[in-house]
Design a protein with these regions (language model features):
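Eukaryotic phosphotyrosine signaling hubs
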Residues: 10-12, 66-71, 117-119, 166-171
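Core segments of cupin and vicinal oxygen chelate
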Residues: 2-8, 14-54, 80, 122-153, ...
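Short loop/beta submotifs within extracellular cysteine-rich repeat domains
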Residues: 52-55, 63-64, 153-156, 164
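Acidic di-acidic motifs
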Residues: 19, 99, 126, 177, ...
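A short beta-turn/loop motif at secondary-structure boundaries
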Residues: 39, 62-63, 162, 196-199
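Short hydrophobic/aromatic beta-strand micro-patches
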Residues: 16, 72-74, 121-123, 172-176, ...
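Vicinal oxygen chelate
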Residues: 2-6, 82-122, 142-159, 182-226
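Extended, hydrophobic interaction surfaces within ordered domains
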Residues: 21-29, 34-37, 55-59, 63-109
C-alpha cells in the first residue's frame, strides 16, 4: 500500500452471529454500548459512532471462532466493571468471557472512553508472515503488535480454519479516501474483494493473510451516525 494512504483508526470489527439481538442487548446492558444503526441484516453497536464499534451480521449458527481469539474493550476500573457482569473475573489485568453465541470478549484496564475498542487478537498460521502482510496493508508495527491510532491488532500462532461458518466477517480501518485505496490496489494488481457505497460511508474490501477481510472505510461528509 502506498505510504501516502495511512489509516487513522481501527474503526470496527464485524462479526457473523447467530444471536444478533441477544448479543446486542448484552453489549448494551453490560458493556456501555448503544445501538448506532440497525437494519434487517445487521446491528451496529458502540459507545460512540466515531470510536471503535462492533457490527453484528445475521448468520446461521453455530459459528466457528476460527481466527478470532477475542475482542478486548478498555475500561478505567476493571474490577468494578467485572463485578457488574453476569460472570467473569479479572486475571493479570484482563477479564475474558463469552457473550451470547459464544463471541469471545475481554476487558482490559486503560485510558480513554470506557468500552471503546482496545485491541483484537487473531490466531493465524505463520505469525511473522501475517504481521508483515498486514503491515503492508496499512497497520503499523509497534513492539511486536500491529496498531492503527490507539487501537491494536495482536497476532498469535494458531489454526485459522473457520470452516463454513466463520465468526469473523472483517476488520475495518478508517481512511480519508476509499477511492485512493481502490486505485492503489488496482495499480499494484491486488484483487478488490468488494466495494460498498452506503449513505454514510464508502468502503473497499481487500483480503489479508489466511483470507482475513480488511475493509477500508471512508466517512462521507455529513457522517450522521451517533
Amino acid at each position: 500500500m502506498s505510504r501516502e494512504i495511512r489509516p487513522s483508526s481501527l474503526d470496527h470489527v464485524a462479526l457473523w452471529v447467530d444471536e444478533r439481538q441477544a448479543l446486542a442487548s448484552f453489549l448494551c446492558d453490560h458493556l456501555g454500548m448503544h445501538v448506532i444503526e440497525e437494519t434487517d441484516t445487521f446491528t451496529l453497536v458502540g459507545v460512540d459512532a466515531k470510536l471503535g464499534k462492533l457490527t453484528l451480521f445475521d448468520a446461521e449458527g453455530p459459528r466457528e471462532r476460527g481466527s478470532i481469539e477475542y475482542i478486548a474493550l478498555r475500561v478505567k476500573d476493571l474490577e468494578a466493571v467485572v463485578a457488574g457482569l453476569p460472570e467473569g473475573s479479572a486475571v493479570d489485568g484482563i477479564a475474558r468471557f463469552e457473550g451470547p453465541g459464544g463471541v469471545p470478549l475481554a476487558l482490559v484496564e486503560g485510558r480513554g472512553v470506557d468500552f471503546d475498542l482496545d485491541h483484537v487478537v487473531l490466531r493465524l498460521p505463520d505469525r511473522e508472515g501475517a504481521l508483515a502482510e498486514l503491515e503492508e496493508m496499512g497497520f503499523e508495527r509497534r513492539d511486536g503488535v500491529l496498531a492503527v491510532g490507539d487501537r491494536e491488532l495482536h497476532i498469535v500462532d494458531g489454526d485459522a480454519a473457520d470452516g463454513e461458518r466463520p465468526l469473523l466477517n472483517h476488520l475495518a480501518l478508517l481512511v480519508d479516501s476509499a477511492d485512493e485505496v481502490q486505485r492503489d490496489a488496482e495499480e499494484r494488481g491486488v484483487e478488490i474483494d468488494d466495494v460498498k457505497d452506503a449513505p454514510n460511508t464508502l468502503a473497499v474490501f481487500l483480503r489479508g493473510p489466511s483470507g482475513v477481510r480488511i475493509e477500508y472505510v471512508e466517512h462521507k461528509p455529513g457522517f450522521a451516525l451517533v
